């Protein structure tokens, strides 16, 4: 568990933050050791600059798992960014309810509610990528720079482009299944620290052996 007072993982640089210690919106949940790096803006302003169209009226959540790496300028766009396609017009009449004599309760009619954004564990989201409402990203996935993610991403899959499409899987199906079974990100911190060599080696057998050690 990271101490609540610890914001910067590197003593020599303040462009990277532990995200869970700079977010205070109860509808945003971030797992241990997930980092955000921003060399343009203050990374402590992630909640304001990177989580957009996120309003209490929609009761929507952003859930990010453990050990994720989020690059500079990555954005999470929520439901209010999507003008409804059910209407005969794209104009936001319900949002401008006072101008048009509508009830305030009709505001949500202006957009299509696609749900929460869920990001798994050990996910890397590249520079200026955009993740849209209703998307779930699986554990170990990689989102390419400036990709626009409109659909769910399976675990350990690399996606890129506009809209984002699968480029390739990082590992074989059997290896992915084993990694999802091991869930190293849920291990005690001491065990993870002892297993870093195994994780960094890319050797799944080595990680399996580490999993069996006390």
Regions found by a protein language model. Give the residues of each.
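Hydrophobic transmembrane alpha-helix bundles
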Residues: 5, 69-71, 176
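Short clusters of hydrophobic/aromatic residues that line enzyme substrate/ligand-binding pockets
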Residues: 23, 88, 207
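N-terminal capping/interface segment
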Residues: 1-20
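Structural signal for interior beta-strand "rungs" in well-ordered beta-sheet cores
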Residues: 16-83, 94, 99, 106-167
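Short, basic/polar amphipathic helix motif occurring as a linker/hinge flanking DNA-binding modules
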Residues: 84-90
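Short secondary-structure boundary/hinge segments and terminal tails
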Residues: 87, 141, 197-198
